[in-house]
Amino acid sequence: MGRFSSLCALTAVIHSFGRVSAAIGPVTDLTISNGDVSPDGFTRAAVLANGVFPGPLITGNKGDNFQINVIDNLSNETMLKSTSIHWHGFFQKGTNWADGAAFVNQCPIATGNSFLYDFTATDQAGTFWYHSHLSTQYCDGLRGPMVVYDPSDPHADLYDVDDETTIITLSDWYHTAASLGAAFPIGSDSTLINGLGRFAGGDSTDLAVITVEQGKRYRMRLLSLSCDPNYVFSIDGHNMTIIEADAVNHEPLTVDSIQIYAGQRYSFVLTADQDIDNYFIRALPSAGTTSFDGGINSAILRYSGASEVDPTTTETTSVLPLDEANLVPLDSPAAPGDPNIGGVDYALNLDFNFDGTNFFINDVSFVSPTVPVLLQILSGTTSAADLLPSGSLFAVPSNSTIEISFPITATNAPGAPHPFHLHGHTFSIVRTAGSTDTNFVNPVRRDVVNTGTVGDNVTIRFTTDNPGPWFLHCHIDFHLEAGFAIVFSEDTADVSNTTTPSTAWEDLCPTYNALDSSDL
């Protein structure tokens, strides 16, 4: 594969946290390379997009065609040299080949090569992100924010500012490359907010700063780029009014803390109505060092005119924590199917298990096939029984209602709560974590669900309106690597009529398969 020519110039912007980055898109190059970074004061080699971590913000407008030319310049011997990028939250209708999940939708991009992802944000707007979908590569740095703006946003009258300065990314950061560390790390070394943070026992390095002007209202876009922990997010002295979850508009809901899981996104309106001062932004991880001593797990909300110093504000007990069950979609709120459990065309109960090394769903641990599922289908294999990996493929017909339940017991899913992400769709959560109630009238709708803890039986519903193979997996990346996934093959017989990959896509597998093992 030859390299594609540069598709557009980068427009540099000064982010509110004081570092120069680049807002790019919807037509752009994205160069993946290795480089040393020290976001928390500790220097390590990482996987970078356009030389920065997190990767640059990619933006577009509702209905835009995204053409993102991914150039693989990876060379570090301790990390993978190939890559594959998933555009998290995009439906990819008609472009299943561009979804980016390695060995489900494509072969990886080999080092020294490039690949053009070409897809359209049809009827989609909101907060998205992109990340490597090859092994645990995104834990080493290949992750970044993505926003599709809606010129006719129904919530536009609720805020004054929505731009590059209102992005808030949360990342777990490890001082050891994923391939060299534990299979299941017990907490990260640090929490990074907009790419900056401190680690316990480390120096007082710079914290990210988000600057606001007193009296203005800001649409903050909060993204969890986490590989593992969930976070309890709050801003001292301020409430947050949620208006979006995972690129789905919801009725405004005011909270004072948000528990956010790997892969999830929220937009909330923050009104800068406090005294001119500095306020701690807090992201308490579910594992690792769970305090705020010395400014760890923190960033700074700074009012214009305040001194450039760390805040002195103190943490307060949350009295309005987000209850996911209280989120109501703004449009078409009803869940598909009949208003009772099992009232769908196909109901599937996912039985989890763990043997100390691998996770299992319905007695099968997912192992990536050598031939991508989409390529198998386009090559003529249309029976789920014949598709590989055997036992992990579930065929579902078109225009059907699907219900999935995730029962959690004391032994079947250690490391809970597990955030599960369905590619190619959003879904209605008719039973949320921590509840025995069901809601078929106006349940929260999103693309990553917290499946809860012991005794929970979280249940989701979606409609099969998007032909192709779609991953359903735990978004704790170390758990996905250990087999915690299945694939829905949706309307398999019609995939060849609705999906026409590019010639470059067809070249991916021969190029990748010809690599020496040292260049994978």
From Swiss-Prot:
Disulfide bonds join C107-C509, C139-C227. This is Laccase-4. Residues 1-18 form the signal peptide. Cu cation 3 binds at H133, H423, H473. It catalyses: 4 hydroquinone + O2 = 4 benzosemiquinone + 2 H2O. Lignin degradation and detoxification of lignin-derived products. Keywords: Copper, Disulfide bond, Glycoprotein, Lignin degradation, Metal-binding, Oxidoreductase, Repeat, Secreted, Signal. Glycans are attached at N73, N76, N239, N399, N497. Its EC number is 1.10.3.2. Cu cation 4 binds at H418, C474, H479. GO terms for molecular function: copper ion binding; hydroquinone:oxygen oxidoreductase activity. Belongs to the multicopper oxidase family. CDD domains: CuRO_1_Tv-LCC_like (cd13856), CuRO_2_Tv-LCC_like (cd13882), CuRO_3_Tv-LCC_like (cd13903). GO terms for biological process: lignin catabolic process. It is found in: Secreted. Cu cation 2 binds at H88, H131, H475. PANTHER family: LACCASE, MULTI-COPPER OXIDASE. One of its GO terms (cellular component) is extracellular region. InterPro entries: Cu-oxidase-like_N, Cu-oxidase_2nd, Cu-oxidase_C, Cu-oxidase_fam, Cu_oxidase_CS, Cupredoxin.
